[in-house]
Amino acid sequence: KNFTLSYKGFSIFCDSKSTLSLNFNHESSLLIYLFLSSSFCCFFKAVMYLEFMFELYVMRHAKSSWEDLNINDFERPLNKRGKKSAKKICEFFVKRKYRFEFALISSAKRTRSTFEILSKGIPEPKTTEYSKSLYLADEFTIINKIKKISSNYKSILLINHEPTVKNLVRYLTKNHETNNFKLMNYKFPTAAFAKIKFDIKGWDEIEKKGMLKKFIRPKDLQDSKE
């Protein structure tokens, strides 16, 4: 069956073969069409931008305690300063409405404790993975692990250790002339994090494709209220 839809000089005709034709009876109808077309194009571009924009947040664990030298390094807890710094970063995440779809956490106690503090404020990730292999991993081991994560996850929070976090950001990013990179490259302090964006189709394409967008240290933020 044929179908015709008309509105104020603008009509759409569809024949039995599903062929569409557009008619404009006056200039205003053409303007309406052009506006709708441009709006759709902007919407389509925005959707495509989001589809291929991936975000990786690389965070170093908060400050840990050295009081008990008999404790194995893997089991060292956070000290008071570390807990306060992790809380400040959590408040920053909450204020900026950051959401992480996948959390990849070293299973050392200080990294797990850092994530536990963050979890009190941020939305729960769709998937959280604790990995002992991250504890002594270099940046290439972590990259290979990230590459295996499904492209359905567009944002990843990684909490790990130095010097791996710094080396990872160095390797993945290409805008090394920025102040953010220079700060990060000078020192990646405890509880600091780097935000990296990738214009890619999947995590298997991340090598040297990232743009460092933020590098935030606890001392850059206002003190939390106790």
Which residues make up each language-model segment?
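Low-acidity, Ser/Thr- and Arg-rich intrinsically disordered low-complexity segments
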Residues: 1-29, 33, 37-42
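Internal catalytic or translocation cores that form aromatic/hydrophobic pockets or channels
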Residues: 133-171
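Domain-level recognition of soluble alpha/beta enzyme cores
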Residues: 173, 177-211, 215
